[in-house]
């Protein structure tokens, strides 16, 4: 009994150095990043892997005349995405269908898959990728447009800042110029003030005419104004507006 226990302890002590590195390696893989964990994982032999992938492709019906490669919905044994190999005719039919209907309902999806000899899931993944590429292209176009708008606004902002700096410098150099400047205003007079202003203007004109030897007379009834010189000659007739007298 004692000899059997000694043999058991001896076998455990001999096997522990072989087990410990394996356990440590598994623990390191568990805490390693996913990409390193994938590289460190033991893989199947190359011949076995090729046989499995070929069988999987034949089962899914992915082999065909190469027109374009699209990602399939599933993943391979090694974690990489499988490529959906489409012929030129299949790609053309899918493109035409996408132009007509960017999103398919289940019935359209099943009909198109049956027409192309694909699975509905493969058609769905192709349409998802196609919509993603279209959205990416539109995003690039919008980004370029917004970039140009930003450059234009930046240039306009720079120009306005330069004008502001020039105006500030001019204000510092000659401040009295801005103090003497009066804002433009529009003068509005009431009718009574306007009559007074017209009377003053007429008085000034009559005084100037007297100084030049011109006498202004009003015809009977207030019809027109006659300007005569000092020697009695008539210079001109100036019609005036007749206002009816208010009783």
Curated annotation (Swiss-Prot):
Q: In which tissues is it expressed?
A: Expressed in seedlings, roots, stems, leaf sheaths and blades and panicles.
What is a GO molecular function of this protein?
Answer: sequence-specific DNA binding
User: What domain of life is recorded for the organism?
Assistant: Eukaryota
Parts forming coiled coils:
none
Localisation: Nucleus
The UniProt annotation puts the region (Disordered) at: 58-81
Checking Gene3D superfamilies in the record gives: Homeodomain-like (1.10.10.60)
Where is it mainly found?
nucleus
The answer to whether UniProt assigns keyword DNA-binding to this entry is yes
DNA-binding region, residues: 79-138
Can you cite an annotated GO cellular component?
nucleus
Against InterPro entries, the record matches this protein to:
HD, HD-ZIP_Homeobox_LZ_Class_II, Homeobox_CS, Homeodomain-like_sf, HTH_motif, Leu_zip_homeo
Please name the CDD domains in this protein's record.
homeodomain
Q: Say if the entry is tagged with keyword Plastid.
A: no
Q: Which Pfam families match?
A: HALZ, Homeodomain
Purpose of the protein: Probable transcription factor.
In the record, the note on similarity to other proteins reads:
Belongs to the HD-ZIP homeobox family. Class II subfamily.
Protein name (record): Homeobox-leucine zipper protein HOX17
Give the source species. Oryza sativa subsp. japonica
Its lineage opens with: Eukaryota, Viridiplantae, Streptophyta, Embryophyta, Tracheophyta
């Amino acid at each position: 009994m004692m000899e059997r226990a000694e043999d058991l302890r001896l076998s455990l002590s001999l096997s522990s150095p072989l087990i410990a590195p394996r356990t440590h390696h598994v623990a390191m893989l568990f805490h390693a990043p996913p990409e390193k964990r994938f590289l460190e994982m033991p893989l199947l032999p190359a011949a076995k892997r090729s046989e499995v992938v070929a069988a999987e492709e034949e089962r899914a019906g992915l082999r065909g005349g190469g027109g374009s490669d699209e990602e399939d919905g599933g993943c391979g044994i090694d974690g990489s995405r499988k490529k959906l190999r489409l012929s030129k005719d299949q790609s053309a039919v899918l493109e035409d269908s996408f132009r007509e209907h960017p999103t398919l309902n289940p019935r359209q999806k099943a009909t198109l898959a049956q027409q192309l000899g694909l699975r509905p899931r493969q058609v769905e993944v192709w349409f998802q990728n196609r919509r993603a590429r279209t959205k990416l292209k539109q995003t690039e176009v919008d980004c370029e447009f917004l970039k140009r708008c930003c450059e234009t606004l930046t240039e306009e902002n720079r120009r306005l800042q330069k004008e502001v700096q020039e105006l500030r410098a001019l204000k510092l150099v000659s401040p009295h110029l801005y103090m003497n400047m009066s804002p433009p205003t529009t003068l509005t007079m009431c009718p009574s003030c306007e009559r007074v202003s017209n009377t003053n203007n007429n008085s000034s004109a009559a005084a100037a005419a007297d100084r030049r030897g011109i006498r202004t007379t009003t015809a009977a009834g207030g019809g027109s104004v006659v300007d005569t010189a000092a020697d009695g000659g008539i210079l001109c007739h100036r019609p005036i507006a007749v206002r009816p007298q208010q009783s």
